[in-house]
Amino acid sequence: MSSAALSGIGMTSQRTRERMLRRLSEKGIKDEVVLAALGAIPRHIFVDEALSSRAYEDGSLPIGFGQTISQPYIVARMTEILRNGGPLGKVLEIGTGCGYQTAVLSKVSKEVYSVERIRPLLMKARGHLRELRLANIKLKHADGTMGLPELAPFDGIMVTAAARHIPQELLEQLAVGGRMVIPVGTEEQILYLVEHLKTASGSEYRQSKLEAVKFVPLLGGTN
């Protein structure tokens, strides 16, 4: 892809991206590192060309296979929660999708491991991420509900689809001191923060309800 396509022209220009960042700030995103990450990633390359003029609007867009690219606000919000004002080491993302959230995470993390169950989506995401030359990302075609136990523990886990309940398999892969952000629910969904806290007798998980959200469902298996 040409440098012009990556930087964007017209509706996909840097100026349009900056307007998106101002809107995110107005909606309460305070972490400058997160805002810089969203400003550095060209969202328009992750959507179909026919939708590129809407890439920097604060809304989700279809990416095929019944999946969507999350609205910029929720990408920023979940990244801000996961970061918690500090650097991130090893992060697991469940649901690569088109790769946009993955790319944002790569800007605020040392390592990002991302799992996607739909192979064609994964292949498309891999192409986008290669264009951006992001070297700290590893993608895997696998059942995201199982995580990546062979690479655990993770300092942060982000789930980008709504689970019926918080999977025990993912809890067990969260490092002590780590944080997981996950939407939970079916018709009504709530974004949860799960913290793995050290205690005098070992460790415990603390769950906090954050806000209402709307995601595609988290499904098991692969295709």
Swiss-Prot record:
One of its GO terms (cellular component) is cytoplasm. InterPro entries: PCMT, SAM-dependent_MTases_sf. It is found in: Cytoplasm. Belongs to the methyltransferase superfamily. L-isoaspartyl/D-aspartyl protein methyltransferase family. It catalyses: [protein]-L-isoaspartate + S-adenosyl-L-methionine = [protein]-L-isoaspartate alpha-methyl ester + S-adenosyl-L-homocysteine. Catalyzes the methyl esterification of L-isoaspartyl residues in peptides and proteins that result from spontaneous decomposition of normal L-aspartyl and L-asparaginyl residues. It plays a role in the repair and/or degradation of damaged proteins. This is Protein-L-isoaspartate O-methyltransferase. Its EC number is 2.1.1.77. GO terms for biological process: methylation; protein modification process; protein repair. Keywords: Cytoplasm, Methyltransferase, S-adenosyl-L-methionine, Transferase. The keyword Methyltransferase applies. SUPFAM superfamilies: S-adenosyl-L-methionine-dependent methyltransferases. CDD domains: AdoMet_MTases (cd02440). GO terms for molecular function: protein-L-isoaspartate (D-aspartate) O-methyltransferase activity. The active site is at S70.
